Structure formats: structure tokens, C-alpha cells
């Protein structure tokens, strides 16, 4: 398993994809998959099944993992 310089809480810049140029904070690092989850980037709409808390169900916007090679660490 490779060791990454990017850690939870770091500020990173998206260098490829639809969110190119955005800067966000790393919410989590998935080292086994070489992926990171960045706050406010790669948002997907997820369906929520009805439950006791939310009897109607519905949709939520959620950050999805992206490959660690698609982000660059922002210094300072």
C-alpha cells in the first residue's frame, strides 16, 4: 500500500474533471482504493429509503470518492 502525502483536513485543488479548479477540504482518505473524498466536490444525488427518521424517503446530495491522482495539495 502506497503512502500518501494528502491527509484528512488538508486543502486540495481539483486538477481534472467537472470540478477542475475548485479548492476543498479532504473529508476522508481511502488508501486501499487510492481515493479521497473532498468537501463540495463530485456531488451525486443519492436516493434514501423511507425509515422511521424519514418516513417519506427522498434524495440527498453526497460527496463521492475521486482518485487521489485527480487532486493536488494546496500549500499554506
Curated annotation (Swiss-Prot):
Kindly name one Pfam family recorded for this protein.
ribosomal_L24
Biological processes per GO annotation: translation
This protein's source sits in the domain of life called Bacteria
- Report the SMART domains cross-referenced here: KOW (SM00739)
Q: Which GO terms describe its cellular component?
A: ribonucleoprotein complex; ribosome
| GO MF annotation: an example | rRNA binding
Q: Which SUPFAM superfamilies match?
A: Translation proteins SH3-like domain
What the entry lists under InterPro entries is as follows: KOW (IPR005824), Rib_uL2_dom2 (IPR014722), Ribosomal_uL24 (IPR003256), Ribosomal_uL24_CS (IPR005825), Ribosomal_uL24_KOW (IPR041988), Translation_prot_SH3-like_sf (IPR008991)
Q: Which UniProt keywords apply?
A: Ribonucleoprotein, Ribosomal protein, RNA-binding, rRNA-binding
PANTHER family assigned: MITOCHONDRIAL RIBOSOMAL PROTEIN L24
Q: How does it assemble?
A: Part of the 50S ribosomal subunit.
Function (record text): One of two assembly initiator proteins, it binds directly to the 5'-end of the 23S rRNA, where it nucleates assembly of the 50S subunit.
Homology family: Belongs to the universal ribosomal protein uL24 family.
- Protein name according to UniProt: Large ribosomal subunit protein uL24
Q: Which organism is it from?
A: Campylobacter hominis (strain ATCC BAA-381 / DSM 21671 / CCUG 45161 / LMG 19568 / NCTC 13146 / CH001A)
- Lineage, broadest ranks: Bacteria, Pseudomonadati, Campylobacterota, Epsilonproteobacteria, Campylobacterales
Amino acid at each position: 500500500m502506497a503512502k500518501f502525502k494528502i491527509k484528512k483536513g488538508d486543502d486540495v485543488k481539483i486538477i481534472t474533471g467537472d470540478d477542475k479548479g475548485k479548492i476543498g477540504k479532504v473529508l476522508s482518505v481511502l488508501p486501499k482504493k487510492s481515493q479521497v473524498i473532498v468537501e463540495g466536490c463530485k456531488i451525486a444525488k443519492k436516493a434514501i429509503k423511507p425509515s422511521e427518521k424519514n418516513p417519506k424517503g427522498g434524495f440527498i446530495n453526497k460527496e463521492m470518492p475521486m482518485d487521489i491522482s485527480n487532486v493536488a495539495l494546496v500549500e499554506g
